[in-house]
């Protein structure tokens, strides 16, 4: 009897009709979900949701317009933001305002840099001396300026070698 029921022409036609109806409903549902608004499938919906042109302090993040597209984009943006755990601008600002400020005493005591050694000469920043730097006089070059230039370069190189030798590790 089971073979007769499966091979019955009415059962087969009803099964084919049900499959066709399911395929049509699936196609309609998928196309309707992708383009709820006609001719706006390729538009980035997130740009419509922001309100950058508002200069008022009481402005909301989302523009309030009685347009169906604006309401759709607002709801879509809120859903995407909640799905990705992203905060909106007004939520970030509210968190910033409600956050506790850092106590100045804690900031001064905990974040001060400490010297590497107990030696006071190493705790200070040493001057940076580059041997390629040279003194360039503002006036026209003369023998006196060249002589000063040579003396300055000599002192810089002596100081550089002194610093290198003293603080070798």
Swiss-Prot record:
TM region(s), chain numbering: 10-30
Cellular localization per UniProt: Membrane
Low complexity bias (residue ranges): 100-115
Membrane topology: Single-pass membrane protein
Keywords (A to Z) from UniProt: Membrane, Transmembrane, Transmembrane helix
Chain residue ranges for the region called Disordered: 98-123
Keyword Transmembrane helix set for record: yes
Superkingdom of the organism of origin: Viruses
Protein name listed in UniProt: Uncharacterized protein R305
A Gene Ontology term for the protein's cellular component: membrane
């Amino acid at each position: 009897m089971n073979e007769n029921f499966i091979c019955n022409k009415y059962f087969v036609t009803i099964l084919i009709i049900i499959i066709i109806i399911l395929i049509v409903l699936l196609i309609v549902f998928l196309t309707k979900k992708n383009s709820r608004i006609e001719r706006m499938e390729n538009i980035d919906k997130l740009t419509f949701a922001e309100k950058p042109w508002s200069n008022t302090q009481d402005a909301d993040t989302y523009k309030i317009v009685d347009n169906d597209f604006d309401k759709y984009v607002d709801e879509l943006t809120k859903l995407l933001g909640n799905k990705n755990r992203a905060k909106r601008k007004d939520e970030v600002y509210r968190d910033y305002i409600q956050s506790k400020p850092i106590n100045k005493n804690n900031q001064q005591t905990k974040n001060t840099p400490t010297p590497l050694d107990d030696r006071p000469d190493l705790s200070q920043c040493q001057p940076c001396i580059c041997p390629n730097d040279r003194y360039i006089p503002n006036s026209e070059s003369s023998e006196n300026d060249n002589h000063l230039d040579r003396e300055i370069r000599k002192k810089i190189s002596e100081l550089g070698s002194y610093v290198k030798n003293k603080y070798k590790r």
